[in-house]
Curated annotation (Swiss-Prot):
Pfam families: Pribosyltran (PF00156). Catalyzes a salvage reaction resulting in the formation of AMP, that is energically less costly than de novo synthesis. SUPFAM superfamilies: PRTase-like (SSF53271). The gene is apt. The keyword Flavoprotein does not apply. It is an enzyme of class 2 (transferase). Its EC number is 2.4.2.7. Gene3D superfamilies: 3.40.50.2020. One of its GO terms (biological process) is adenine salvage. The lineage of its organism: Bacteria, Pseudomonadati, Pseudomonadota, Alphaproteobacteria, Sphingomonadales. This is Adenine phosphoribosyltransferase.
């Protein structure tokens, strides 16, 4: 399947979670076996080209795509979690959201010093979470140069923000709006 075929599998839900928002729902994409498999193939191809030695994904939808890409490539997966979800000593990073703050944590023993880690997530909007994840992975010793997404919302400038921080950013598709 082409990326245009995959784009047609993404459902748009108007006015969710608030009026004026066009929510890009991946449920219809991941429910389509051939579509999900093709999506993982496309992302794995990009991760392989980036020289990935491991894949990281952010909770929650980044787990869907990141773990599948890692499995397809025979690589390990590093879950980037919300606070308090890991049963071991973690390292974390606080970061700003549009309205407030949040925190990400990882198990630093999941990363080897200098290991090339590619970030995979479902969607990039403002880029804040991906930027924080890249910084956190680097704090643990990872070499992070690439972030891959299924969907980019270019009007929110997240990809530009990540590129400005030195990351190569690729998405399988983009959609207008927020």
């Amino acid at each position: 399947m082409t990326t245009d075929d995959l784009k047609r599998l993404v459902r748009t839900v108007p006015d969710f979670p608030s009026p004026g928002i066009l929510f890009r729902d991946i449920t219809t994409l991941i429910a389509h076996g051939e579509g999900l498999s093709a999506c993982i193939d496309h992302l794995a191809h990009k991760a392989r080209a980036a020289g990935a030695q491991a894949v990281a994904g952010m909770e929650a939808r980044g787990f869907i795509f990141g773990a599948a890409v890692a499995a397809r490539m025979g690589l390990g997966f590093i879950p980037v979690r919300k606070p308090g979800k890991l049963p071991v000593k973690t390292i974390g990073i606080d970061y700003a959201l549009e309205y407030g703050r949040d925190r990400l944590e990882i198990d630093p023993t999941a990363i080897r010093e200098g290991q090339r880690v590619v970030i995979v997530d479902d969607l990039i909007a403002t880029g804040g979470t991906a930027l924080a994840a890249a910084e956190l992975l680097r704090m643990a010793g990872a070499h992070v140069t690439h972030a891959l997404f299924v969907i980019d919302l270019p009007e929110l400038h997240g990809a530009e923000r990540l590129r400005g921080a030195g990351l190569t950013v690729e998405a399988l598709m983009d959609f207008p709006g927020h």
